[in-house]
Each structure stands twice: as C-alpha cells, then as structure tokens.
Amino acid sequence: MKKVTNNRYLKCVLPLLLVALLVSAASAAPIGLDPGKWAPATYQRLAAFVEANGSGGPNYDPAKPPYVVFDWDQTCIFNDTEEALFRYKIETLNFKMTPEVFAEAIRKDIPKDNFSDDYKNADGKTVNIDLIGADLDAAYTFLYKNYEGFGAGGKMTLAEARATEEFIDFRAKLAWLYEAIGGTFSADVSYPWVLYLFSGMTADEVKALAEKSNDAALADKLETYTLSSSKTLQSKAGYISMGGYKRGLRTVPEMSNLMNVLRSHGIHVYVCTASLDNVVRVFSNLPKYGYNVPEENVLGMRVAMEDGKYVPRYDDTWVQTQQAGKTEAIKRELVSKYGYGPIAVFGDSQGDYRMCVDFEETQVVLVVNRLRKDDFGKLGLQAMETHGKPDAKFILQGRDENIGAFRPDEKTIKYGKTEPELFHASLVK
C-alpha cells in the first residue's frame, strides 16, 4: 500500500517538478544569454536587463529602439588590437612612408620637453623627442634604403633586415617612444600619435594588415617580453631597454554572445573606441571573430586622408574618441539620431569613465575589473555596494589575465599572479 501511495505521489509531483525545472532553466537563460564565465550577479542583471528592454519586454518601443555602447580594447577583447597592430607593423616593417614623412609622423604634436623620469635611458639620462627622433630617423632611413619591401631599391629580405643592428634599434626605440609619450603627455597628444604611423596607407590596406595582426596575435601565447636597442650603433638617445610589452590577443565569448543577443532582441549595438575606427572595424565586424558589429556602428579615432591615403594629421572635423570625447562622439552621432542616450555602457578604463556616467538614460554600466585606482576603478566600489540588487546600475566583471578570459566572479587575477583581487589596494581602506 505504501508503495502504491508513493507511486501516486510521484506521478502527481514529478510533472510539477519538471515544470519548475523548466521555469528555472528559462529564468537562468531566458533570452539566449550564455552564462559562460560571467560573475553570477552580473549575468543575472544583464539577463534581466535584456528581458526588460529587448523586444517583447515591457520597456521596448520599436519606434524608439534602445541602444548600447561598448568600448573595444580590454572590454570586448583581451588586450589591445591597435597596440598589437603597432608592434606587428614594426616586426614586419609594414610602413608606407618615405623617411621624410616618417620623421614628420613621429614628431607630430610631441613637445620637445624631456620625457618623464620613468623613461630615462639605461644610463639614467633623460630623453626627449629630438634625441630619440634622430636615432629613429637614422634607423628607418637605413631600412628604407635596404629592405626590399619598401620598394626603394633595397635588396635585403625581411629576415636579413631584421638581423641588422638598425632594425634592433628601430624596433626597441619606436616601441619605447610610444610608451614614453603615453606616460609623459596628455591623452590628446598620445592617443593620436600612434595613428600617424599609418600614413601612406589606404583604409583597405590598414584593414588587411589589421586582420593579419589579429590572427597572428590570437595564435600567440599570452606573455610579456622585453625589447632592447642596439649596443653597437652610435646614438643620441643612448641604450634603451624596456620590459612589460604584452603579446597576444583573445576574443571574449561572453561579450560576443551578449552583443548578438542584444541585437536579436532589437537593441542596437555600437562600439566607441580610442583606437582607429578602421582597425576596430576589422575585429568587430568580420564574422570569423564572432562579434558581428556593422562597420558603420563603430565610432573611433580618425586620421586625415589625402588622395585616399592617410596623412600624419588628425581629422579636424571629428572629435578624439577618448575620455570626454567619447561622450561628445555619442552625442554627435547617436543622441542626434535617436534623441536619447544609451541604456547601457560597457568599459574597462578611465578613458571610458565619462561615457559611463554622462547619460541619464543609462540603466546599466558594466565595469570590466582591471583593478584600476582612478575614477573608473571607483565605479567598481559602487557596483559592490549594490551587488545582487535587481536594479543595480553598476555591475562588475572579473577576469584572469593569465589566460585572457573572464572568470565567474567579480575579482580579477592580474597577469603573473595567482590570487584574485576585488579592488586596487589604494581603494581598500
């Protein structure tokens, strides 16, 4: 009798349990958003956000479609696509400038002041653009005349050119110069500078090179490395050696899935980047990378063009899409189009801070946790104050920099470390 009762009980209860499980599964991934390695609270907030604001949701109005804005480097991907391309150009000597144009490009808008004390040469002497510029001029001129790829009559193969002391000096000092400019001068000087090295190239040439660089970097091991200049060449700047250069890129499947889910629910997806627009368009648009962002939906830095080729001058009709310039670009291109601001913004750095806080319509701000100590890093503090709340505006996502991937937690493991951290030490009191 007891067995029969149990069987009857199971027959009644099992269907109810099955329904409950199905409802639970639906609530966990109701809109196709893959839990992946999202921090659970971050995932739940994003899923609820899409449900409420996407097509079929209570807040959705097809006459006023919502839109979101993502930063690109270190947000949608791991590491920086433009920095990877910069060093790929150096390694493969992919430049389209005469020595005269190169000399103009590396000096464009750079003050003659000494670089900060963090960027002295190996002998502890200060360096400035005049000193290192002279060394780079000499090295580039040698390579331009001797490497066959420049088409100036040289006979050296790439392998032969790379074996020269001039290439060793060129590689180390141009990479170092990028770091020294960024570490010494303001963002409006440093951000455009690297773009001027595309001078002489067409947009299509830049895109083709960016794709090659992406593919090479995606296959690379994630590591840091050191570059040192020639010890035998006579030079103005002296011997320079610097470590900490980052090798390798990684896609972030959680971000590509999120972008695709947003679009499938009628939420328009945009990217606002401080990299060159055409460089990011390659990574964000080509189907093989998985993000599928329309090219016209990428707002980025722009370099002036003459006769269809880039020249060493910023496009003075366009804003610099970094810091407050990101907000201005969104207002110019998107608020003017839609009549309202983005309902969500995604970023990782101080360069994204303004666009994360400047729009009253923004419901969600995703903070990729890089353990920053600036105003952007403080958004992570706000995220943890409202952690798990259904209406949280700021949400935090951790990652493991050793493998270039999200981790299912708000804490981040820095490269070379094993212990996860929630905030930069300076923010913890």
Task: List the model feature ranges, each with a label.
Residues 12-17, 25-72, 80-124, 424-428:
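Non-catalytic pre-domain segments flanking phosphatase-related domains
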Residues 86-179:
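Conserved phosphoryl-transfer catalytic core
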Residues 29-47, 51, 57-60, 65, ...:
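C-terminal cap/substrate-recognition subdomain and adjoining C-terminal extension
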Residues 3-14:
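Bacterial N-terminal signal peptides that target proteins for export
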